[in-house]
A protein has these predicted regions:
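Transmembrane-helix signature of polytopic, lipid-linked glycan biosynthesis machinery
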Residues: 1-14, 54-63
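Hydrophobic/aromatic-rich transmembrane helices and adjacent perimembrane loops
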Residues: 10-36
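Conserved beta-strand->loop/alpha-helix structural units within folded catalytic cores of enzymes
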Residues: 24-27, 79-85, 90-92
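Signature aromatic-anchored transmembrane alpha helix within multi-pass, membrane-resident enzymes
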Residues: 28-58
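Juxtamembrane/interfacial segments around transmembrane helices
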Residues: 37-43, 74-76, 93-107
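Hydrophobic alpha-helical transmembrane segments in integral membrane proteins
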Residues: 52-81
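C-terminal luminal/periplasmic domains and tails of membrane-associated envelope-modifying transferases
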Residues: 83-88, 96-324
Length: 324
């Protein structure tokens, strides 16, 4: 009843913490009910089953939370590889591979990495804000509403619906992808809500000239190994600063290490770099790997045809990626 009165609900699928209140009463009532059974052996069997269920539930709960923690740590390490610094007042919208139930699931880790100190002397005010990816946020982004105000547990935030940056991981196998309204690239696995507001995501809020930040060991853990996502993030950063030569160098490293994209849209920085450097053989290799992802293929075609490249290269790109 107290949970319902404050507008919360119990979700058994996600091991909701709101069941803890009721669990105390249940723990008292169940032994009383079992005590009415006269057969002592049957009582032992029932208690054994209940203890077994409780143990498995706690193990499953711990396993799920450990997996979510690892996934979240990996998410923010990738962000740190991609983004040197975020401007004060940036409003993030994240799409995690795991569920995000509150806005502080985003602004909490973001501020720990980029702006660990409060912006105000007398109360806690983070430098980076966040919005939940839900229908309410989508409506306000469409309506171009301005700055909002929220105070929770004496922490003040000022998210702005006109000042958003979207960070998305479409599925666990995908890398974290920064959405940029100047060139929107969407995974075939992307959430429909992200697709709706992708054209409002402002990558200009990334401060490219700053030094890269290292996430603190607690709570982000040790740095993951440098696999595909590391090279993708560094290539995406190099592309944003216009260093196409560096993108090509990273692409060659990817091929030498035989790394593969699990989400084909992540080839885009390398495709553009190889188009600028007129490396047709690399474009052919990438095209053969991307061929099964029709949406990624279509986006590659559209982007290549708008690039300022030699007509012969554009013709080759059309042949490779623009399948009618």
């Amino acid at each position: 009843m107290p949970v319902i009165l404050v507008g919360r609900s119990v979700d058994f699928k996600s091991f909701s913490r709101y069941t803890l209140i009721a669990s105390i009463g249940t723990a008292l009532i169940l032994p009383l009910i079992v005590s009415f059974i006269s057969n002592l052996k049957l009582q032992d069997i029932i208690f054994s089953i209940l203890i077994g269920i409780a143990s498995l539930t706690h193990y499953a709960n711990g396993f799920v939370k450990a997996s979510e923690t690892q996934s979240t740590q990996n998410f923010w390490w990738q962000v740190s590889w991609r983004i040197p610094q975020l401007g004060v007042g940036t409003t993030l919208i994240t799409h995690y591979a795991v569920a995000a139930e509150e806005d502080y699931f985003t602004w909490g880790p973001a501020n720990l990495i980029y702006h660990p100190e409060s912006e105000h002397e007398k109360y806690v005010q983070p430098a980076i804000y966040a919005l939940l990816l839900d229908e309410n946020t989508i409506e306000k982004v469409f309506a171009r509403e301005g700055q909002d105000y929220s105070e929770r547990r004496s922490i003040r935030t000022y998210p702005n619906y006109r000042n958003i940056l979207i960070l998305t991981q479409p599925r666990p196998e995908s890398c974290v992808q920064v959405i940029d309204l100047r060139q929107v690239e969407l995974s075939s696995y992307e959430d429909e809500r992200v697709k709706q507001i992708a054209s409002y995501s402002e990558a200009d809020q990334i401060e490219l000239s700053d030094t890269f930040q290292t996430p603190p060991l607690i709570p982000f853990g040790i740095e993951p190994e440098h696999g595909w996502c590391y090279y993708y993030q560094k290539a995406s950063y190099a592309r944003q600063v216009g260093d196409w030569e560096q993108v090509s160098v990273l692409g060659d490293a990817v091929f030498n290490l035989e790394l593969q994209a699990q989400d084909q849209i992540e080839w885009m920085p390398f495709i553009q770099a190889y188009a600028y450097s007129e490396n047709i053989s690399r474009l052919q290799e990438i095209a053969s790997m991307m061929s099964k992802d029709k949406l990624a293929f279509q986006q590659a075609c559209q982007i290549l045809l708008t690039m300022q490249i030699e007509s012969s290269i554009k013709s080759q790109a059309d042949r490779l990626f623009c399948i009618q």
